[in-house]
Amino acid sequence: MHLPRPPRRRSAAWAAAAFTATALAAGVMPAVAADTPSATATAKIDSSLRSAVAKGGDATFFVNLKDQADLSGAKKQKTHAAKAKAAYKELRAHAESSQKSLASFLDKGKVGHKDFWIANTVEVTGDQDLVNELAKRSDVASIIKKQKIKLDDTETSDKKVTKSRTTSAGTDSSATGDETPEWGISNIKADQVWDQYENRGEGIVIASVDTGVQYDHPDLVKQYRGNNGDGTFTNDYNFYDPSGNCPSDGTPCDNQGHGTHTMGTMVGKHGIGVAPNAKWIAAKGCESDECSPENLLAAGQWILAPTDHNGQNPRPDLAPNIVNNSWGSNDNDPFYQDILDAWNSAGIFEALAAGNDGDGTTCSTAHTPGAQASAYAVGAYDSTGKIASFSGFGPSPVDGSAKPNISAPGVAVESTFPGSSYATESGTSMATPHVAGAVALLWSAAPSLIGKIDETRALLNEGATDVDDTHCGGTAGMNNVWGDGKLDILKSIDLAPHTAATVTGKVTDKASGSALPNITVNVTDTAGVVRTVTTDGDGSYRLPLQAGTYSFSFSGYGYANGSATGVTLAAQQAFTQDIALTPTPSHKVSGTVLDVTGKALAGAKVQLNGTPLAAVTTDAQGQYSFAKVAEGSYGLVVQPAAPVLCNGVYNSTAAVGSGDLAKNVQVPNRTDNSGNSCAPATYAWIAGSKNIALSGDEDSATVALPFPVKHYGVSYSSASVTTDGLVNFLSSRVGDYSNTALPTTGVNGVKGFIAPLWDDLTLDKKSSVQTTTTGTKGSRKFAIVWNNAAYGNGTSGRATFEAVFDEATGAVTLQYKSVADKGAGATVGIANQSGTDGLQYSFNQSVIADGTAVRFTQGAK
């Protein structure tokens, strides 16, 4: 990236706007416009999309398919884990089958697309002709323009409130977490549940689809499911950021504050949260103040089947019990309906905000998705017991259903905020997490209800305090202002079936007898369902369990694992399970880290997950050392320092036994989510022989490929070459002089390309772009060569580089004969057709040496 260019090229433009995706694939311009769709087909296209593409431009939209998965089998499963697994299996299989024909159509037309399984929808970018063709398809139900969805507007106190603390970020703020509760906590009688039932949400996992969470906030860190209890964190399966705003290693973040605030109301310590001993996980479905539909869909999928931070290797068995959604839209689009149905079928209780579009009088101001009939929507009231002026009323503007379902405290709610601070905010966003936390208390106190959505809603409604306001319809007991009334979780729990046994215990050091805090206690029933609690500062734990037979396991750093098996509990039994754990010896762990070429890798970060030990950094010889590591098995993670180039993250196990451990490692090749990888290659320059008609500052030309070239699973017979060092497969473009990091979602519009040296380049009389083909059929190589390209902003020096396509392997090798600035202003890498995946070798880094090469190899996906 160099200095900004003049405004004549302020944004990228299509080189030939009349080209449709299908026309580009065929290599010809359509002679006439596509057939006008029938009235039936046109009705599938929403009006905003019709307007967006009417003038010849492109738009991004969602193609919703007619056929829907049958989730009745999932609902019939007995346990939460079984429900989630069955729902995931059915949804994935159904999407793969029903989307196959549409995907084939799009691939044939060289149209990039992103497929979702939880809502059976496909995200596509295209023009009017493509939209019309899709509308004609019999398998398509509707085509909806992509719209940004805003977070609920909240009223925030200008004053950030900081409670008295002796702890810092990353440290649990107290052993018990009890203080004078916030007004909303006492108003719904959560504090009375703590006292009367000795229940704070133990064994329940709450999730959030929001702006993220400050995971190491002192009042949230202990409850994070990714907290290993020893100072380390496992973020895979516990935090997901489809927006790409958080660090690439999966570390949770919150760049807005909304998500941290709502999470605090659910599980925060010091009287802030309703269920302070529940665990939490989160999906960052909202980039900041806005939430993109594709990120909300990805987040919705992750809730049902959590993945690693790359969105891979789904685990529906790790799905949360409850999910909070404090966001919505006032356009009355039935967005997210399929996701709500999937969550409900999987036994995941969802709480949704009724919205802040009310004025205290007007009816039908609730917003989606809370306004949908299948949603459990929450209105807001203040500390005087009055309905909030902003709270959304029913009946639903979407389907006429009664809304909200219930109301909770939502005015002047103090909770956690990024920067390890606190803020006071108002909105139905603040009311909704009161309900999510209340369900955690209910399910912890009455575990026979876990996963039973209808029964749980009925108990919440029955326990609520009626408020008579029928000006928007309804009755004194259930109306479109208050729903079933004010949340009273104590009464709901009083009404719940109390068949649970109560297990308490204390974990101590066998040698000294001292109490052991932060010991993980896993309790597994005969069906394999696991509930987890962590010991408090005094080594104690407590967990309500249904009658049955269980196995207990106890684990913590520096101690041998303990267990108790065959523990049979009767209904309402009080049972004590104490245990003393044996300290383990410590040993040295050391080794050498090598890069992908086998050379010593200096500056790499080496950490042992599952220990409280600080990470160490490799020296100039690639060596690392931990002086004392307790016996046990730990996750060994090696992260290369920037620039990482083709060096990937190493993940393995370090089993520390009876002596010192020498563990040498070689990091793997980096890969993207599609399985493409890169590696340094042997430099073997191929000179060009045939000139391409390119010249000047911004120009592009389409070249025929001598053999089919696959790019992210799609085969191409032609590609567009630009002066700015790009090979585009989707379109002939100019104006992409401002390079960006990869992947490129939402940036510049450039997608589906290879970037040998994406920079602001220009071709003068001393420059050229050429092609050449070598070898025989089956083993040919095709090179696109940029000779002596100048830098567009007057930077001294030039660049000569090429992209070489290998027919035999499908790989592409990028070679660099001479690059004056060594890539200091360029992007090198590849990106997929939707801009959602890519593999970046470098971005604005001086890492390209003359006479070097890097090869990108196709993945299996």
Predicted regions and their residues:
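Hydrolase catalytic cores
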Residues: 281-289, 408-477
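Extracellular S/T/G-rich loop segment that most often corresponds to the catalytic His/Ser-adjacent loop
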Residues: 231-233, 240, 367-444, 486, ...
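Protease zymogen maturation seam
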Residues: 35-38, 86, 137-205, 218-219
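Subtilisin-like serine protease catalytic core
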Residues: 33-37, 56, 73-75, 136, ...
